[in-house]
């Protein structure tokens, strides 16, 4: 990954249990971008991407491509929300470090379903911490690329966060190797 004084970019390439994916995360002062592409699976089980799981707190508002809960907005296509009481045991969660301590809580979960054996599935989600429902609805993300070669977004200040999975070019910037970059008008991080 890479970082400047107010933005960060991280990348994760998954190859686990028959599921492969390229995932990139872009952080700035207003939003967190989650991009996933090249999602493939040979597993007989359904594949999903979890965006957030937390205790439910109050109302949930939804639109065609947005969800808002507890001061956090989510923008993206095919977002799936589930709520309900879940039961667990902190003793199991901690790996046996603590004594058994059963608990129940109403949870809010949001994610994307990719189905069984997806081929080249992808997703684009933006998380908006501190946003109102109206701000969430009206937010216009600037996602430049989300493909096997490059994942890139334009941040609110005009800087560009980019993950190159291969050599490539973005505007006047060119890299001969895979890399993670933040591009501004006068600096490269």
Indicate where each model-derived feature is located.
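Extended polysaccharide-engagement surfaces of secreted carbohydrate-active enzymes
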Residues: 1-189
């Amino acid at each position: 990954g890479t970082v400047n004084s107010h933005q960060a970019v991280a990348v994760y390439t998954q190859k686990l249990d028959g599921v492969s994916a390229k995932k990139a995360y872009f952080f700035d002062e207003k939003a967190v971008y989650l991009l996933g592409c090249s999602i493939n699976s040979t597993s007989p089980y359904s594949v999903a991407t979890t965006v957030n799981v937390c205790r439910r707190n109050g109302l949930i508002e939804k639109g065609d491509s947005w969800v808002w809960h507890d001061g956090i907005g989510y923008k993206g296509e095919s977002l799936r929300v589930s709520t309900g009481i879940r039961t667990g045991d902190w003793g199991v969660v901690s790996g046996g470090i603590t004594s058994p301590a059963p608990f129940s809580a109403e949870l809010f979960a949001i994610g994307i379903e990719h189905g069984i054996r997806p081929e080249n599935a992808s997703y684009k989600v933006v998380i908006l911490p501190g946003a109102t429902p109206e701000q969430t609805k009206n937010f216009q993300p600037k996602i430049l690329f989300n493909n096997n070669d490059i994942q890139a977004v334009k941040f609110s200040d005009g800087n560009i966060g980019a993950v190159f999975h291969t050599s490539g070019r973005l505007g006047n910037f060119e890299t001969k190797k895979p890399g993670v970059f933040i591009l501004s008008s006068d600096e490269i991080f």
